């Protein structure tokens, strides 16, 4: 069997072209605030004493609504918050700013906290995932 250097060079060039000009297989993480964006940290929930107080979006806090506070996500963003300890999750709308305690990523309304079964603990580890970005009005 005779070695053909032209065929070898052509095959190597073809393979190198595939590697260089084919998009990578690694997926890019969703951008901040976009569908699929996730954060891991701790969640806490609002006290009943805050009932009726104005939130950062101008609305009044109502413990029965499934709302939440996040430091930077736009108001109106819908997120799914999951408690990995028990597997329970809840969908909430961002309506306020906070929490401003290190390690905490989201403050939940009482109704949302109840859904995650976190009322007794007060603060629990969670994963938060954007399921619907805020509308740009």
What are these regions (language model features)?
Residues 2-12, 18-137:
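Secreted/periplasmic proteins
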């Amino acid at each position: 069997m005779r070695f053909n250097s032209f065929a070898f060079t052509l095959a190597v060039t073809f393979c190198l072209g595939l590697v260089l000009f084919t998009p990578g297989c690694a997926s890019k993480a969703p951008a901040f605030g976009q569908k699929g964006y996730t954060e891991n940290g701790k969640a806490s929930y609002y006290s009943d004493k805050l009932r009726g107080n104005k939130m950062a979006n101008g609305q009044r806090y109502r413990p029965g609504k499934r709302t939440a506070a996040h430091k930077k996500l736009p108001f109106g963003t819908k997120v799914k918050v999951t408690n990995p300890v028990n597997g329970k999750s809840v969908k909430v709308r961002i309506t306020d700013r906070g929490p401003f305690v290190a390690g905490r990523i989201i403050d939940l309304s009482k109704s949302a906290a109840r859904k995650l079964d976190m009322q007794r603990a007060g603060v629990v580890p969670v994963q938060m995932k954007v399921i619907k970005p805020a509308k740009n009005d």
